[in-house]
């Protein structure tokens, strides 16, 4: 990256669930620079990021947004680093020190999510990791909406669905899943991207050519299909 010379071997700040501002490479390099240095002046920032265009304007925007604090012509980070897992919610913006014990613990935090649709009463239920790196349908649609970078597993689903409209995709995916309320095996003779997506998500498995079985837990009365 343009700021590789400013990367550090020690602790760094990692941001989860970035917005358009906090996703910027300069923003991420700047907060790590301020994390490593104390009593930083504007002159020091300009020397460290020589050649960065509109630096003053960007800095003012970060201050106005509440991410950077300026006092007595000195600059420091104004956000709070994560110090507890208590009260975490899915998709909240998180700043965490990569050397913190919490950084590894975050990888184990999951939330049970239910996804409804406008076509029928079927509900898809998944355990979604806080980092949204695992392959779940909920996280895939989330990243399509926020334009966050896909994980390698999620890219496999993108190769099938692309930036599909969630309502459109759910219409066909749930309609196919509903067939399993009536039978254990479903035959699909024509190639179908939504069936391919269900297999990629481990909602289904192809037990023989063009024949599929459900790999989810199903509550036929409440129409809840839970990924195992």
Regions found by a protein language model. Give the residues of each.
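Polyanion-binding and phosphate-handling cores
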Residues: 12-102
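Charge-dense, extended regions
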Residues: 199-202, 208-210, 215-228
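A short, conserved structural fragment
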Residues: 63-74, 195-211
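Short, amphipathic alpha-helical interaction segments positioned at domain boundaries
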Residues: 81-115, 218-228
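Short amphipathic alpha-helical interface segments
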Residues: 23-43, 98-189
């Amino acid at each position: 990256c343009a700021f590789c010379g400013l990367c550090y071997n020690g602790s760094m700040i990692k941001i989860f669930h970035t917005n358009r501002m906090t996703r910027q490479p300069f923003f991420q390099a700047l907060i790590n620079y301020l994390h490593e240095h104390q009593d930083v002046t504007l002159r020091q920032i300009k020397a460290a990021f020589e050649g960065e265009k509109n630096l003053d304007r960007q800095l003012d925007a970060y201050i106005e947004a509440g991410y950077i604090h300026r006092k007595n012509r000195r600059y420091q980070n104004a956000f709070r680093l994560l110090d507890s897992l208590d009260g975490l919610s899915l998709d909240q913006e998180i700043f965490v020190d990569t050397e913190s014990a919490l950084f590894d613990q975050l990888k184990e935090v999951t939330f049970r999510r239910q996804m409804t649709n406008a076509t029928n009463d079927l509900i898809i239920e998944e355990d979604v990791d806080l980092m949204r790196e695992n392959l779940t349908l909920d996280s895939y649609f989330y990243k399509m909406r926020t334009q966050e970078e896909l994980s390698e597993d999620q890219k496999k689903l993108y190769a099938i669905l692309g930036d599909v409209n969630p309502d459109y995709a759910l219409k066909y995916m749930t309609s196919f899943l509903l067939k399993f309320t009536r039978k254990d095996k479903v035959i699909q003779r024509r190639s179908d991207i939504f069936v391919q997506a269900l297999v990629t998500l481990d909602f289904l498995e192809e037990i023989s050519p063009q024949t599929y079985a459900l790999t989810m837990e199903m509550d036929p009365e409440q129409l809840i299909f839970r990924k195992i």
